[in-house]
């Protein structure tokens, strides 16, 4: 059966030891998820503190911090996506790292919360920094939240794909059948995640795992919510700027 053969050939083809992973170049690959979160929070805090002398709404200050946090997280992610090889992702997925789940939940909740904050800010009429400046901050927040959402799910799909198969720990779960690609890298998973984010469907990649299918369902629903809010915010901004 194609699915079974695919799973075994892909899983065994990427099997590698912890030593091989640790010897791979790049300290960033070995940096725990929680440390990336802490560093990004530190960047956001420093920038927000540096802007304390400037008079602005507290929520505007928080939004600037959120933009810095999001950009920092995406820089980490971009560097990892472009440099990490499939066999490294496989070993990473085998590690018991509860911090990854915690970071995923925290950042996902913060991303959703940022949209609520942006909607509240758009009702503000004080514009202490000027209408155009604050509008730019809010739009940047929406864009950062959108990219960060799909970046989070890129990580999730990759770790689910390369996690141990429950019936055979020597192979990985797979769960996604990517045409002509047995050993996908992070950019393949980014393609899958961002296509769902933009179209609410999975295009040419077939889902064969119940767990990934459920994650994709949640991802699609959140993407629909985000895109609906983005359209509403865009209309609000255009009307507000014309008034």
Question: Where do the language-model regions lie?
Answer:
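Short, Lys/Arg-rich, polar N-terminal cytosolic tail immediately upstream
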Residues: 2, 6-30
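Membrane-helix interface/capping segments
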Residues: 78-96, 119-127, 159
């Amino acid at each position: 059966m194609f699915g079974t053969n695919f799973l075994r050939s892909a899983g065994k083809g990427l099997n590698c030891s912890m030593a091989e992973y640790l010897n791979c170049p790049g300290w960033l690959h070995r940096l725990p998820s929680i440390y990336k979160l802490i560093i990004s929070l530190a960047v956001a805090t420093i920038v927000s503190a540096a802007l304390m002398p400037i008079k602005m709404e507290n929520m505007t200050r928080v939004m600037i911090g959120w933009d810095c946090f999001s950009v920092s997280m995406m820089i980490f992610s971009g560097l990892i996506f472009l440099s990490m090889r499939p066999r490294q992702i496989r070993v990473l997925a085998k590690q018991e790292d509860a911090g990854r789940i915690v970071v995923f939940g925290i950042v996902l909740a913060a991303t959703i919360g940022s949209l609520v904050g942006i909607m509240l800010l758009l009702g503000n009429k004080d514009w202490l920094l000027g209408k155009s400046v604050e509008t730019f901050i809010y739009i940047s927040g929406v864009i950062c939240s959108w990219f960060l959402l799909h970046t989070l799910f890129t990580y999730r799909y990759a770790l689910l794909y390369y996690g141990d198969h429950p019936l055979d720990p020597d192979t990985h779960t797979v769960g996604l059948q990517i045409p002509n690609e047995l050993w996908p890298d992070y950019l393949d998973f980014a393609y899958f995640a961002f296509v769902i984010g933009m179209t609410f469907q999975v295009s040419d990649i077939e889902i064969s795992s119940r767990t990934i299918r459920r994650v994709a369902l949640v991802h699609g629903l959140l993407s629909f919510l985000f895109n609906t809010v983005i359209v509403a915010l865009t209309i609000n901004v255009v009307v507000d700027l014309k008034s």
